[in-house]
Structure formats: C-alpha cells, structure tokens
A protein has these predicted regions:
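Short amphipathic helical patch at the helix-1/turn junction of helix-turn-helix
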Residues: 10, 21-22, 50
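Short basic helix-loop element that most often maps to the first helix and adjoining turn
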Residues: 14-33, 63
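Short, conserved catalytic or interaction motifs in soluble domains
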Residues: 3, 46, 65
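Recognition helix of helix-turn-helix/homeodomain-like DNA-binding domains
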Residues: 36-51
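DNA major-groove recognition helix of helix-turn-helix/homeodomain DNA-binding modules
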Residues: 55-69
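Helix-turn-helix DNA-binding elements, focusing on the entry/boundary residues of the two helices
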Residues: 16, 27, 38, 53-56
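Conserved hydrophobic/aromatic packing and binding residues within compact polymer-binding modules
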Residues: 16, 30-31, 41-44, 70
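A detector for short, charged/polar N-terminal pre-domain segments
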Residues: 1-11
Length: 71
C-alpha cells in the first residue's frame, strides 16, 4: 500500500507541475493564486505531501478545471 500511496502522490504532483508550467506560472505565482504557500506547492509537485481534499479543490479552481482532470 505504501508504494501505491507514494506513486499516486508523484503522479498527482507531476500533473500539477505540468499544468502550472503550461500556464507559464512560477510556483510562487501559482501558490498565491491558490491561497497556498510556495513550499507547500513544491512539496506537492515532488510527491512529498499527502494533499488535503480542500487543497485539491483550490488547485482545480485555480486551473479552472474539474478535480477529475488532475488525475
């Protein structure tokens, strides 16, 4: 189960990073738009954080996409 948890966090983080860079946003700009801290966004993108559902919603809203599109 631990391997799955780590893998899903890395996949999610890679998707967030891809969408962010596609928009041309720095981590700092993106974090500001989401209402989150830059270091938190960095940790999410590296797959180091077990992200809260509330923060997934903030990220999806910032990208103006459905939550499902983050996975």
């Amino acid at each position: 189960m631990k391997a799955f948890e780590n893998n899903i966090k890395k996949i999610f983080g890679a998707r967030v990073r891809a969408l962010r860079t596609e928009k041309g946003w720095s981590q700092e700009d993106f974090a500001f738009e989401c209402g989150l801290h830059r270091t938190y966004i960095g940790a999410v993108e590296r797959g180091e954080r077990n992200i809260l559902l509330e923060n997934i919603k903030k990220i999806a809203n910032t990208f103006r996409i459905d939550i499902a599109e983050l996975f």
